[in-house]
């Protein structure tokens, strides 16, 4: 498709959408868009501050690599809210009149690129974090010697560049991103699918997203099973496993949030790609799936805000007090210190220790 012909879909799509647009309340949609954008930006900003502070405090390799990837994920969510939310509010404020403010289809293309990138990149980073933790738990020697912060930064850059490449594929193939039926967002062509290329972009996007979720699930399952086996087999290195446990809990929460939020949208896009113009998917269904996917960028930062040792410890104490249970300062992250205390007590009660104490007291008497 030539560049001149690529400019035509903006106006033609807008004309077709005029008859198939979703019936949405403009004022209510503007209000919710502003609320979602504000909450997302504030939440991700708070999570970025927490992760950066944790990265400065924990310089150990096993923690630093995870925190770098987590920071990249939250920063991606932050800019996704900032760009996508800002464009959406502008579209609503302009009464969704794309022909008037975007005749050249530039804004729609930017919107579509940002939608694809901010959708796939967090999923890719989530699977990368799961792989990193799986290696750290199953092969700690290789992780500590081969996976450095420099390597993690290179991997982070590579993941982001691949997500950018996927987002730019339609532009490189001289295809425009299309205004969707609700006239509030832009994405791949989901209406009036003409050829295999339209189906390819939708299937490629859905396949990559579902693959990332599958990798996260597999790696987290292996990590969890390994930690359980080590726990029952040996009681050494509790403190090291406590860091693994905290990060795995966060990974499981991210995976659950991503699956719940993104699966409907990914399956919907795959359904449209497979069935084409005969797809039973309605505009309202697609818009609902999109809004669920948007919630992923809001919930992701709260995983790092809430699922921290200090917060969980306080929540545990609060819940126990509310239930009327007497609390002993005992939780999973303090087992190592208790074990060390027991070891010290056992050594102090041994005969050798008693002799040393008697010699020390006699010398003190002299």
UniProtKB/Swiss-Prot annotation:
Keyword Cell cycle among record annotations: no
Gene Ontology biological process: adenylate cyclase-activating G protein-coupled receptor signaling pathway; cellular response to prostaglandin D stimulus; inflammatory response; negative regulation of apoptotic process; positive regulation of cell population proliferation; positive regulation of cytosolic calcium ion concentration; positive regulation of gene expression; response to estradiol
UniProt-annotated location(s): Cell membrane
Coiled coil: none
Xref: Gene3D superfamilies: Rhodopsin 7-helix transmembrane proteins (1.20.1070.10)
GO cellular component: cytoplasm; extracellular region; plasma membrane
Principal localisation: membrane
Membrane topology according to the record: Multi-pass membrane protein
S-S bonds: 108-186
Stretches in topological domain Extracellular: 1-31, 91-109, 176-198, 268-285
Origin: domain of life: Eukaryota
Glycosylated sites: 4, 19
Gene Ontology molecular function terms on file: prostaglandin F receptor activity
Entry keyword set: Cell membrane, Disulfide bond, G-protein coupled receptor, Glycoprotein, Membrane, Receptor, Transducer, Transmembrane, Transmembrane helix
Function statement: Receptor for prostaglandin F2-alpha (PGF2-alpha). The activity of this receptor is mediated by G proteins which activate a phosphatidylinositol-calcium second messenger system. Initiates luteolysis in the corpus luteum.
Family under the similarity heading: Belongs to the G-protein coupled receptor 1 family.
Name by which UniProt lists this protein: Prostaglandin F2-alpha receptor
